[in-house]
Every structure is written in C-alpha cells, then in structure tokens.
Amino acid sequence: MPKYSTEKWWARSSGRLCELARVAISMLAIAAVGVLQPALAAAPKAAASKATEPVMPDLSPWLQKNGEPGQAAWQHAAHFSIAYEIDPGHNTPAPASTQVDAGYTADALWLRFEAQDPHPADIGVHYRVHDGVNSDFDDFVGIFLSPFNDAQWSYEMFCSAGGAEWDAFRQQNNEYSSWDAVWSCTASRTATGYQVVMKIPFASIKFPHSPDPQRWGLIFFRNWPRNLRHQLFSRPLDYDSNCTLCSMEPTRTAAPVTTTPADIQLIPAVTVIRTDTRKDPTEGLAQGSPALKASLDARWVLRPDLEWSATLNPNFSEVAPDVLQLSANRQFALFYKENRPFFEQGTQVFNTPSLRFSSDTFNPSGTLVDTLAINDPRFATKLVGQVGANEIGALITQDTQTNIVLPGPQSSTSQSFDFSTRDELLRYRYDVGASAFGLYASDRDGSGYHSALYATDATWQIDPSDVLTALVGSSSTTYPGAVAGALGTTPGTIDGLLWTLDYARTRHNYNFDLNLSHVADGFRADLGYVPQVGYDQGAFTGEYDFYAPDEEWWQNFAFGTVSNWTRATEGGENLDRKVKLYTALHARYQSRIFLYATRDEQFYQGRIFTLDQYEMDAIAQPAQWLNGEIDVVGGDGVDYLGIRKAQLFSVNTTFYLQPGKHLKIDLVYDYEQLNLAGRRLFTANVYDLRFAWYFTSHLFAQVIGQGQEVRNNTALYPPGTPHHSGTLASQYLIGYQVNPWTVFYAGSSEGYEETVDGQLQPQQRSFFLKGSYYFQPSF
C-alpha cells in the first residue's frame, strides 16, 4: 500500500470542500433565521419553569452497608408516577399503577419501580439475556434519559419483570437497539405485581461537564402487554407533534454531579477457531489448524461529555449469523444491520438524513454512513462527544479488505478487493432545541483508489407538528484500472452531487411527508449505503387515522398512500412511477392487518413495465406465547435476468414462540415464485429457524438452521443458467453473558452447498471459542 499522505488528501479535497462550504453557509444562514428565533423566544418560558421542576436528591447518606439504597433512601428520593396510557389510549389513565423513586449517588443514577397489576398472574416473565426482551411477550419498565435535555437524543434503558436488561439509543424518532451499556437491574415478584431496581453508572452515559446541578430530561415507561400492547408514560404525549423527546420532564439533581467517570475501560478478547474445508469435491473435509486471535478495545472517558476509544486487531467475528435475505431477482445490493460493538457505540453522531430509492421496495432508504463498508480493519479509533450544543465525531480505520459497490440508476454491483484503505469519517452538528444543522466528511484512500464525500444537513423543527430536513452532498471518486475493470466501469475520476429536501407534518389524525431528491450519476458514498444513483425523485406519503372509543374490539383504522415519481438524470427516462394505496386495522390480540394495492410503471433496460400488485400483511398474537406475521404479495413482477414481465407470488412469514420461561423459538420463512405465461420461471425458498433455551438471564444454549433454495426453469432462461442451487447452514452455541462485553461462547457451525446432482455436500465446518472481559483498571 502506498504511504498515506495528508498533503495529498488535502490537495485533492480542498477545492471541493470550499465549494461545499459555500453551499453549507447558505443553508445554515437560511436555517438560522427559522431555528434561532423560536428557540430564543422559548428561553424565558423555560427559565421560569425551573422552580417547579422535580429535584432528585443525593441518596448517599442513606445507603446500606452493601452500597445500595435501602427503604430509608427511597423515602427521601424524588417520586414519579407512570400515570398515562399513550397507546392504545391517548393520554388516558393508565390501567395499572406504577410508582417510580429516583435519586443518585457518587457514581450512579438509581431508580426503583413499583409496578402494580390488577391480575398479577398475567405478568409476562421470561428468562432473557441482554437485549433479548420482547415487547409483545414481556412486562418491563424503564426510562428515556436525555442528559442534555435537548430533544435531540436519549438513552433507553428497560428491565423486564424477569430481570433482563434491554437498552437502546434514540435519536429523535429513530431507535438504535444495537447500542449497549454496562448497567444492572434486579426484579422481584410481589403479591400485587413486581418491583425493579436499576443502577445506571455515570461511567456508562454521557452528560454535561458542568459545575452546576445537572438538568436532565426524563420519561418513565411501562410496557403492559395483554390483549393489546399498552404503552404507559409518566408524561402526557403531544399527538400533534412529531417530536417525542420534546415531551420529556426536565429534572434537576440536588447538587452538581462531581464524580469523574472511570478514566479507562478495557475489553480484551480472545477467539480460538478451527475451520475444516473441502478442497476437492471428491474428498471429505480437510482438517484445519486452530487459529488464535487476540484483540483489545479501549475507552478513555476524557470528561463526562467526551470520550476516545480504539480497537487493536479487532475481533469482529459474529457469534450468531444475520437472518437470511432472499437475494434472487433483486436489482440492488442488500442492506444489513451493523452488529459489531466498536461501531455500535457512540457512532450515532455520524448519522445524516436518510435517502429514498425509487423502485427497490426491499431497501427503501439509504445513508451516507454505513460502517459495514469497513470490512476488516487492522485498527480503528474514534473520538465522540457533545460540548453544550456542539456534537463532534471523528473515526479513522485501516481496512485490510475493501468492499466497493458500483451503483447505477437501475441496478448495482459489488466487488471485494484485497488492498488496504485508510478510512476517515468526520462529523460536526450544532443543536438548537429540536432543530440542528451539521457538516460531514468522509475519505477513503488506497492503492490508487480514492473516494471523498462532503455534505451538510439541516433540520428545522418549525413547530411541534412540522419539520423540514435538507441534505446536500458532493463526492469525488477515482477508480484505477484494476478496480474499474473488476467493477465493469471506466478508469478515472467521477464527481457527483446529491441533495434531498423533506417536509413532514404530524397531527393526531393524520400525517404526511413530501420529499424531493436529486442524486447525480457520478455520486458515490463508498463509506455509506447508496446503491442507486442517477435519478431525480418526488415522493409523497400520507395517512389518515380513525380512533376507536374506549373498550372497543378495535384500536384504530387508517388509510393512506405511498407514491413516487422517479426520472433518470441521464437520458430523462421515467424510471419509476408508483402509486400505492392501503388500509390498516389495529385490533385486539395485538393484531394489525394491512391491505395494499399498487400500480407501478417501472423502466428497466430499455423497457417499460406496467405492474399491478396486491398485498396483505397480517400480524397477531393469538396467545400469550405466540406472535406471528404473514405477508402475501400477488400480481405482476419483473424477471430482471430475462428483462420481461412475469407473474409474482410471494409469502413471507415470521413466528415467535415463547412456550414457558425458558424456551424461545423464532421461525422466518420466505417463499417466492415467478411465472411466465402460465409456466413456472423460478421458485425460491429461504428459511431461518432458531431454538434457544435460557437457563438463566445470563446462560443460554442456541441452535440455528438456515437455508436457501432456488429452482430455475432452464427452458425459459439463457443457456448456462443453473437448474437449481441451494445452501444450508447450522450452528450450535452455548453462551454466558455477564454484561454486553463480558461474555463467553463455545460452539460449532457447518455449511453445505447443493451439488449438480441435487445433493447437499458439506463445504465447511468450524469449531470456536470466544471470550471477552470488560473491566476498569485502577492506576
């Protein structure tokens, strides 16, 4: 790899940065007029209300010998009530009583929940590991905690009636369940319900670095699943607002929080794996040699609102595989969720407004930042924090394997290359109330390949109901000859511009969203997920809701539309014109039924296809131990390989079974077929079956089976098309989790592929041990 040069990077990028800066300054000036005026106008009202805000006391004087609050401490705590049902009721009295006591000590926030129940026997209690709580099955309580009280983001921490933890990060209306933290909770049954005690260490959260008392935003929450899933809040919700976090209750600490979080947090990890592979189709698996890999993650809390973290020789091997997605007859690259701890923690600051695609219903949105593009880094480091209203983020990695997606107006391709790249992400955002504006830059460089992207975005919360979002980005990408040849494109440098403007309104009975976008043919986001380029688009979504009176068998009925018009930037062809109408009914047994009718005019490879499709999606929980979803689609489709219209039929099913406290079964099955003039063109099946037995909330065993099978009618396809193909994979695993990063796993996995004679032949077998340990050293 050539030596990385900062001067070279700056020479390439400074001109484009200046160009984007001019655009950014214009956008920020426009945004400031609308953003700052209402924010400043609201300031006196906020100041005047501080005298009536709840105050959390320091519980340290009343701690027991074990360091935990006792009954005397809870009597001195601040008291709250989860008094409102926000769904299905609309700020109606909660059907079950929940009292919350809150306070803090030198190192942690402490919460106690007393959850009463009119029928205690109906409380859903199951063993789960961290993040295993299921809102359809489990009773749980918890908190939305916004330490900066800025209506921009919050932590979510919940504890089930069985003592299992679940946490997430909420950024405005987007929830990221992959975020994890080290905290603890205990749960115990009472004669009239259950009690939960939560301890949230200050070392695990980010909060303002201030000599004054903290002023945090809080909402306490209870999940109460019965015939309907009842969601209970400690604060009333404004249904004419699209800003949930604006409903938080400002709560002060009685004194400044003077604690300094743990300076250093370390997570060493070791993986031992042996992989046997088939080198000759006529022979068995050849036994491999055991390989040991050690890694170290480090987190340094510079101050409560700023942290630096790094990973050396990172261990990114996944214990459980992703749920399979059907890849047959798809236009664009599939999107997968990030599950690697280093990239899950603190990277939400890099998020930018999402993008819409035209005809790809399987991946309806994209993003400028997708850390899965960083495939196999030798090292990675990041700095993230929030100082007042300023949010900052910087991430640098050395990636040893480079994955590149070549997007297009109608399809995308991808290739993996063995050369290394230096990857950099930079983000700055300034928050003003629920509004914000920011700058973003990314750079990827190695072996003659280079991709740079600069962007600016702004969010203007005009009023509680209306929000305007804008994003402008510019990219420059250089493909050397070898890379261009593998991708099937022309060597050289290409540039492109992206912009998107979105206006959304939310009211109690209706909501709508209007979006305009432009993505140039030369635009690239190689450290993001943008598989479609070269289009202009207008899109509209809208819905109107009718709500049932209390005690009815149904909850609400809605009808709406999802429509878009997409035109190619090169040539001006209409790529896609779609109108989708739907109705939806929510009723008892947590049931939801959606009916869709779609007319779609789609342009592909020089042809226009007029497609009519009909869809039914049904979700229900007919029993306390069973939840399922069935989605059926029928009508017209496109055979993208043969470039012809066909008849489509697909069934997608998902079932979750919880027969008892210990056993959990998940089943996903997808079926799809295309027919041409009454003759079967292809049939595809995908299944994912998972059995898990939870001995406790820390110890579990799991078995996973996955398979994909495709059958093609070779008489209707070009010569060389295989008649059938199939894969099968299995995994056996036993795991023990103390917290998200102190874990031990042992297991094995096998992979099979279908041979030309239709037999499944083992191709790979692995045995693995993985352990990691989270600790805070004292120096």
Annotate the PLM regions.
Residues 376, 474-779:
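Exposed, low-structure sequence patches enriched in small/polar residues
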Residues 107-109, 153, 194, 212-216, ...:
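Outer-envelope beta-barrel architecture signal
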Residues 260-309, 419-485, 551, 619, ...:
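Surface-exposed extracellular loop regions of Gram-negative outer-membrane beta-barrel proteins
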Residues 201-209, 243-259, 302-306, 346, ...:
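Outer-membrane beta-barrel proteins
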Residues 1-20:
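N-terminal secretory signal peptides that target proteins for export/translocation
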Residues 41-424, 429, 448:
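Structural preference for beta-rich elements and adjacent junctions enriched in aromatics
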